[in-house]
Amino acid sequence: MKKIVAGVDEVGRGSLIGPVYAAAVIFKKNIKDKEIIDSKKIKKTKREIISKYIKKNSIWAISSASLKEIENFNILNASLLAMKRAIEKLKIKPNLILIDGNKSPKIKNCLVKTVIKGDQKIKEISAASIIAKVSRDKLMNKMSKKFKKYKWDLNAGYGTKDHIKAIKKYGITKFHRKTFKPVHKMLSLKKS
């Protein structure tokens, strides 16, 4: 039986806004591209080019867990849910799933292994990281057009100085994760 390996990673877990995304990638052939590395280490324009290359040379799926799911289940469980959805969307069933980190969703009839810093060690996980990041960044750019003051197109919703300053000045939006410490803290200060 041919070994079919899927790499899985999530993005947006530490963001203060919006959904968390996950991708699953199975390469069609053995790819040794040196540019497929952890998405956080690649400049945005290059990441978009590499994402297209990955999509052309792999079987892939992207999924997400909504803001509501993050608030209801917590970010870890929402991330695992997004990963499971991405895996289930793959057109081919892998017999080995490699997941970045130390937690994995429950997947039936398949060997699942977690790999700490997998996005730096395993090409399939790096590829999943790249396509998930490009996809989520597109959403952040779109959302940023309506909420320019928060600069989500630049910070992807993460708690940068500019983003925190904007929250303090303009308040939180319906897209902010209210259970996340910096956002929750702002809400608590407002109430007192």
Regions found by a protein language model. Give the residues of each.
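RNase H-like, Mg2+-dependent phosphodiesterase core
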Residues: 1-192
